[in-house]
Amino acid sequence: MPKTSKEMVAEADATVPRVSGTEAKAMLGKPGVVFVDLREPAEIAASGKVPGALAIPRGLLEFRADREAATPDPTLTGAKTVVLYCASGGRAALAGKTLQELGYGDVKNLARFQDWVEAGGEAEKT
């Protein structure tokens, strides 16, 4: 039986650990930790992003995260811990499950960029 998108997000949420904005702030700048903003460029331009985060729209993630793809991102493929976020958490959950399937061992879901901001995190303007 086909799954709904809501079911897919719930399944991904169950496998990708969540981190709070406060926990994410403590991770920023640590060796091997990479933040990935999965929002579209216009969304990032409107609100900024976590300082130093890679901006990889959800639709391009597999091609940038796959070490054997034509266009892997060396910053992402070399990460020990990947912290994902988007606007509402759904894209981050699905992306986290995808990264796990690609062999990434330590993937975290910050969920919403707003969680970062509400925890006092700075927004880097692009």
Identify the function of each model-found stretch.
Residues 36:
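Active-site flanking residues adjacent to catalytic metal/cofactor-binding acidic residues
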Residues 1-33, 41-83, 88-126:
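Rhodanese-like catalytic fold shared by cysteine-dependent sulfurtransferases
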